[in-house]
C-alpha cells in the first residue's frame, strides 16, 4: 500500500492543477463574455461562484502542499495520501462542473476548453483507486 502513496500524490497534484487551470479559463471567460450589456462576471451569482471556487482551490492547495512536504520528508501516511487523492479529484469534478455552468451552453461545446476539462475530470475519481476506496483506506486508518 505504501508504494501507492506517490501515485496518489501525483494524481492529487494533477487534479488540483487541472482545477486551477479550469478556474483561470473561467475567470477570463466571465470577464470577457457579456450578457445584457455587462460582463457575466459582474453579476452577483457569478462573483459568488468564482469566490467559492477560489476559496476551495486555496484550501486544497494548502493541503496538497502540506502533503508534498510530508512526502518529501518521508512522513506522509497512506491515509493522508488517500485524503489528498479523494479531496482533490472530487474538487476537480466540482470545479469543472461549476466552471462549465458559468460558460452556459457554450461550455458544453467542443469549441471551449472547459468542455474537455469537464470530461477529463471524471476519470480522476476512478484511476489510482476510486473515491470509495480512498474513503475505505481513511476509515481503516482510524481503526474502523
Which sequence ranges carry the predicted segments?
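Alpha-helical interface subdomain recognition
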Residues: 2-144
